[in-house]
């Protein structure tokens, strides 16, 4: 787990509020730009996990209602950072309307339509989940300033090379980046490297949203 302090987290949240985007969009932009920087390809896909409990009936249904879909982005280096983020936002809004579709059926269909040379290969290097559990709001004060705590636990089964969960800490509203990974596929050193550049890309983009992706990659 990597911890981002409260003050820099607030800078990211302020950017999201100013430009009317979710932090999930900014995280996805940072991740796909990191892979674009590392691999030199404009076409990057990341699995996006969605906690789908849209109705009261679903909220009380029990069990797991997590759906995962690949989110593909194709941005050349001359695209402005903010324009790419807006594109991600609009495409997410379009995709999430269908988030109740069975992801297992989708991946089975894709494997038949676009077969890989051997089993186990995929287009996506990792998966992302953002848990928007920011409860530092006035509502808690109205209820007597109820204290709460959260903790992230892996379930012991890592079926993919890398899975990132980003959550807010209840004590200061900073961000925790929790990586679940297969140790033979991704090392701790590689995770540190990715986290370092992910943050640099997000902050550079938030500070200079008019810069192009290529300019940000050079600056970080």
Question: Language-model features: where?
Answer:
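Flexible, P/S/T/G-rich "lid" or insertion loops adjacent to the active sites of thioester-utilizing
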Residues: 1-21, 111, 219
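Histidine-centered acyl-transfer/condensation active-site motif
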Residues: 3, 21-23, 167-190, 195
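His-Asp-centered acyl/peptidyl-transfer active-site segments
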Residues: 15-24, 28, 38-151, 183-188, ...
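Short amphipathic C-terminal alpha-helix that caps PH/PH-like domains
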Residues: 85-92, 191-205
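Residue-level signal for inorganic ion chemistry
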Residues: 99, 164, 191
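Low-complexity, glycine/alanine/valine/leucine- and proline-rich hydrophobic stretches
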Residues: 143-172, 181
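AMP-binding/adenylate-forming catalytic domain of the ANL superfamily
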Residues: 204-220
């Amino acid at each position: 787990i990597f911890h981002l302090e409260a003050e820099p987290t607030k800078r990211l949240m302020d950017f999201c509020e100013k430009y009317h985007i979710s932090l999930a969009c900014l995280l996805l932009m940072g991740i796909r730009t990191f892979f674009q920087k590392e691999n030199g390809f404009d076409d990057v896909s990341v699995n996006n996990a969605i906690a789908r409990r849209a109705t009261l009936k679903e909220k009380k249904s029990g069990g797991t209602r997590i759906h995962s879909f690949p989110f593909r982005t194709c941005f050349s280096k001359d695209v402005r950072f903010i324009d790419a983020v807006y594109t991600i936002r609009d495409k997410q809004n379009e995709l999430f309307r269908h988030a109740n579709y069975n992801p297992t059926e989708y991946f089975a269909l894709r494997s038949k339509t676009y077969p890989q040379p051997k089993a186990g290969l995929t287009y996506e290097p990792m998966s992302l989940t953002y848990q928007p559990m920011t409860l530092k709001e006035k509502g808690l004060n109205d209820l007597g300033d109820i204290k709460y705590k959260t903790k992230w636990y892996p379930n012991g089964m890592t079926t993919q090379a890398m899975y990132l969960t980003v959550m807010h800490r209840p004590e200061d509203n900073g961000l925790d980046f929790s990586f679940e990974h297969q140790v033979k596929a991704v090392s701790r050193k590689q995770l540190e490297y990715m986290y370092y550049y992910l943050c640099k890309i997000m902050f550079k983009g938030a500070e200079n949203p008019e810069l192009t992706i290529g300019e940000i990659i050079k600056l970080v």
